[in-house]
Amino acid sequence: MLNIRHLWVLGIWELGETNLFILQSIIAVGMGAFVIVDRAVAVYFIWGNFELTTLVLLITFIGGSGVVKMAVFVHNRRQYHSLANQLDELLSLQRGSCSEDPNLAAILASSRRKAARLTKGLLLLMLSQTLLWISVPLVAYPEESRLPFVQHQWDHNNKFYEISYIVQSLSAVWVSQISLGVDCLFAAVMILVAAQLEILVHRLLNIRNDVDIVCKETAILEKKELDSKSDENMYDELRLCIKTHQDILRFVAFLQDIMSPIAMTQFVMSVVITCMALFQATYSEEFSAVLKCASFLTIPVGQLYLYCWAATNVTAQAEAVSAAIYSCSWVDASERFKRALRLIISRSQKPLVLTAGHLYPIDKGSFLTMKKPARK
């Protein structure tokens, strides 16, 4: 999986303990520590300058969000490994159905491509934005010793300027890639889960009584035998669908527990950063400060929307499962089939909604609601 390989390169996902991975982990921890210390010291020395302090705090919160998510991820590393293993098991449940039906196979393949393209696109976008920020001082202020993110007011950037520039740049790239990489991992998982629910919808719709298509000339005795076999096949397929549905719900519950702390961190940080950026953009008299604040908004808002969009797809497909149940050939089915059908009906009636911190629903409605206070 592309997301796992990416996080392994950054030193927070272990694919076998090697000297290389230990070095990668040390670099990740070092970059995270530098981001916190460098930003905190910078805020201390400029405290009292409203506009400059607000701008540095924005940078601090963005970097701090990545460091917090990295710390949570590393602390719960075994649970994330378990999540990956359970996802593989979940994808294998309907592999047989996908191999028999090209349409189902196309849904699965499309979800994998979507997850990979989304991950590549967003990570490259984040990298390009970070590199743009890194290059601004060299292009806009070539004669001044200015650092890309926060300035060292205590020595006016005179001491260790080159080293400070390089470390600030590397730490920004490393931490931002970790922050968005974790978000893309969860988004990719939710895309694959939504695809599994969509495949289940098609399987439920395909449950039908084959006797309905038997020719009228078929003998009555033969028709009864076919009816018995068809009912048995319908019941067996329904049992498999119920088991798959239960396995998907269990996986989503586990995903909820794993994702909740990081999603809550992203929600809180996104709201704080958005409010601070809009506040300074509104009251600042310098146009350059307004542009800087506006450029910051794309990062937290984009990360927040990523969660809401992916989780909404899961909820929508879960609702589609409920609708598909009533569309299968249950009217002329046996009582045994109808009793089994009640199980999946009763469970699918409860909305499948992911939450941040087990408190706030993650969906597009919540995204719009959280943006309203920031615009006021």
Name every feature range the model reports, one short phrase each.
Residues 35-38, 62, 82-85, 89, ...:
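Generic structural signal for well-ordered, non-membrane alpha-helices
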Residues 42-47, 71-79, 248:
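Cytoplasmic, membrane-proximal interface of class
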Residues 69-88, 186-188, 194, 198, ...:
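Inner-leaflet juxtamembrane helices
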Residues 1-57, 89-190, 195, 199-226, ...:
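Helix-loop-helix junctions within predominantly alpha-helical proteins
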